């Protein structure tokens, strides 16, 4: 007998006892059953849930501390094992960031005055790459190597775009920067189709109309392919719907595709990703590791 059957039998037994004591008629018994069922299946679980939540909130500090203590010890062991490599990585990130800062300070006035789209795009990519590399460092030091690889994918994507812009110059860089309008409009349209199910407020029709108008003007200027993903590179690639793999080839970085694919296993919900475990044990890890 399962829990529901046991609960139903207990309710019926109690209803029969109360009905006999109070000499209830058929209508009274029905009302009593309704009250008992509501109390058991609606009020009861709510009271239990409220109590469980209250106890859980009281236990959170202790629970988190129990998790934090071994994690801190683990990170210290990981640092001791991989300190040389981690220090080299961090020093590379620091030097790269400092070089970017010097370049930005030297050319800032030139960028603002001449509205040089190429320099602006490359500087923005450099900033994003420094932030991403810093995230890789944090993940490595915490033992999340697969997640660090996932962020390395972003570094590869940034490198591909940077190489492509450098090769083709300011006209392509301008298209790249203006493509933010296309992505904003696409996001707004997706929100418009989903806000009700999300339980959010509807978008402002005026804002959406404004975004679409900006998109349409850019498509008139650069062609209808501009509205597609990577549409800013459509003319350079020679395809209406270029893919990132097309961009890799055009940037002469497609030889790194195997690394990019391997890093993707930690990102996407594929079968391969479920089996690729960066560890020396066959145990399925739900915690960080030193490899």
Regions found by a protein language model. Give the residues of each.
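Secondary-shell segments that build the walls of catalytic and ion/ligand-binding clefts
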Residues: 1-110, 180-291
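Short, solvent-exposed helix-helix connector turns and helix-capping sites enriched
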Residues: 82, 144, 168-169
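Extended, well-ordered alpha-helical segments in internal regulatory regions
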Residues: 161-169, 269-273
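Short, glycine/acidic-rich hinge or "gate" loops at secondary-structure transitions
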Residues: 148-149, 166-177
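Long, hydrophobic/aromatic-enriched structural stretches that serve as scaffold segments
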Residues: 95-164
């Amino acid at each position: 007998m399962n829990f529901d059957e046991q609960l139903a039998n207990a309710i019926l037994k109690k209803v029969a006892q109360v009905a006999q004591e109070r000499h209830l008629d058929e209508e009274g018994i029905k009302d009593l059953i309704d009250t008992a069922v509501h109390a058991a299946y609606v009020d009861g679980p709510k009271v239990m849930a409220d109590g469980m939540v209250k106890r859980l909130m009281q236990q959170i500090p202790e629970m988190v501390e129990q998790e934090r203590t071994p994690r801190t010890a683990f990170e210290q062991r990981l640092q001791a094992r991989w300190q040389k490599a981690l220090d080299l990585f961090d020093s590379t990130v620091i030097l790269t960031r400092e070089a970017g800062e010097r370049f930005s300070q030297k050319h800032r006035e030139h960028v603002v005055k001449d509205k040089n789209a190429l320099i602006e795009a490359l500087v923005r990519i450099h900033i994003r790459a420094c932030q991403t590399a810093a995230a890789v460092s944090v993940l490595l030091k915490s033992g999340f190597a697969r997640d660090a690889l996932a962020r390395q994918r972003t570094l590869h994507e940034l490198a591909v775009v940077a190489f492509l812009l450098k090769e083709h110059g300011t006209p392509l860089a301008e298209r790249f920067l203006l493509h933010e309008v296309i992505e904003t409009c696409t996001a707004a349209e997706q929100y418009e189709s989903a806000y009700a199910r999300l339980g959010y407020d509807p978008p402002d029709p005026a804002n959406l109309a404004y975004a679409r108008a900006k998109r349409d003007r850019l498509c008139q200027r650069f062609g209808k392919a501009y509205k597609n993903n990577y549409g800013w590179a459509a003319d350079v690639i020679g395809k209406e719907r270029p893919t990132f793999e097309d961009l890799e080839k055009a940037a002469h970085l497609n030889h790194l595709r195997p690394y990019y694919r391997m890093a993707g296993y930690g990102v996407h919900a594929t079968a391969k990703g479920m089996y690729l475990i960066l560890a020396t044990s066959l145990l399925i890890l739900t915690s960080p590791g030193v490899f």
